[in-house]
Design a protein with these regions (language model features):
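N-terminal hydrophobic/helix-forming segments and targeting peptides
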Residues: 1-185
Length: 185
């Protein structure tokens, strides 16, 4: 059970926004390697583990899971904030305001998704969800430093995983928990 918990936690902490899953694959390989005869990663970041049978007549079986996660992509900078009106995967933008995020630069920069203040809004606008284009990422950067973050930089949730009893909560668990389950088949 300890190893399952560690695998879930480590994989949830790994960054792997769709199209750039290499970091998550490296973490996954750490758990896969002791269970198979060989591992390798292809140019697209896909991780393969091969376990050979001692029976030369054995059938080949494929077990697979994916390790990507939904996220956002930087589309510009304004007043030291990052624009991100592009979502990668099924992001529900209504849940984004005040969410902790990680901008996947080297080193990673932490931030929070901000929304416009309601002071200038009409009564009709107040209480309605913000449009994705209204949201920005605040990393506490100067305008000059924000401009150094290239358009196209991926952004993932900054949620820390946690356990409540035997229940696990964290980002990207829909994909990563499936991988952990495959380790025990």
């Amino acid at each position: 059970m300890k190893l399952i918990r560690k695998a879930l936690r480590d994989l949830s902490l790994a960054q792997g926004v769709t199209g750039d899953e290499g970091s998550a694959a490296l973490v996954a390989e750490k758990f896969l390697r002791p269970l198979v005869d060989e591992t390798h990663m292809d140019a697209l970041g896909n991780l393969y583990g091969i376990r050979r049978s001692k029976d030369p007549q054995a059938k080949t079986v494929l077990l697979d899971a994916h390790m990507d996660e939904v996220g956002m992509m930087v589309t510009g900078q304004e007043d030291g904030l990052l624009k991100f009106n592009t979502c990668v995967g099924g992001v529900d933008h209504r849940l984004l305001p005040n969410l902790a995020v990680k901008v996947l630069t080297d080193p990673v920069i932490e931030g929070v998704i901000t929304c416009p203040l309601s002071l200038g809004q009409t009564k009709e606008e107040q209480g309605k969800p913000f449009e994705l284009e209204d949201l920005m990422i605040d990393c506490g950067l100067s305008e000059e430093d924000a401009k150094k973050i290239p358009v196209g930089t991926r952004v993932c949730y900054g949620t820390e995983p946690w356990f409540v009893g035997n229940r696990f909560f964290g980002k990207s668990t829909d994909d990563r928990a499936c991988f952990v389950a495959l380790l025990y088949i």
